[in-house]
Amino acid sequence: MNERLNSPLMFLSVLLYCGAAAGAAGLAAMLFPRQRRRGVALLVTGIALVLIAVCWPVRERRVVDAASRLDRIMPRWQFEERHEIRIAASPDRIYSAIRQVTAGEIRFFQVLTTIRCLGRCRERESILHAPDAKPILDVATGSGFRILADDAPHDLVFGTRVAPRTFAVMNFHVEPDGRLTTETRVFADGDAARRRFALYWRIIRPGSGIIRQSWLEAIKRRAEGKQ
């Protein structure tokens, strides 16, 4: 398994949460007279860390030589995450598992999506409110996502508009040796859209990474017959 944990955007998410925790600890310490000086220091440190995380500039990346369907579909992006896993199964079995895996098989999926939308996504079926027993890709394509490439048993690419002028694309790529990768890319068109999505991404990035890795593990269990 592998994830780009050292990517700047993941680091900024950690910085954001550390700043929020330091600020909260500082406010709590300020309630006690003997701890007020320490509380002020923690609060100032926390605010500084949050401001650094929020204001850090976003760098755009571009594909030079398209090597995959994903490269051709989204050659420019500012936000990304990538995960991979090794599966002891044929590409056909892996691809079938990708299409059939359900939200109920993905550990922490329901908990993290509920936290992500603060309980406000429970009225209609969507990727953030997916039934346990329905294939998660069927839920996605029925609620705003479109299949952009379906090259069985190696490439599946789908995407959606996540906000005005902001587009997300995600893929699953199966190698002949059983290596499965998934990559998410987001392109925000314009400075205002980029700033808005940057804050959102830095907040949800840790939970998103957990979901993506758990999703791959669920595919692995299904493909290897270990559900």
Task: List each model region and its residues.
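A conserved amphipathic terminal alpha-helix motif
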Residues: 15, 19, 25, 196-227
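Hydrophobic ligand-binding cavity/cleft-lining segments
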Residues: 41-42, 53-137, 142-144
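Hydrophobic-ligand binding "helix-grip"
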Residues: 6-18, 32-43, 54-66, 136-177, ...
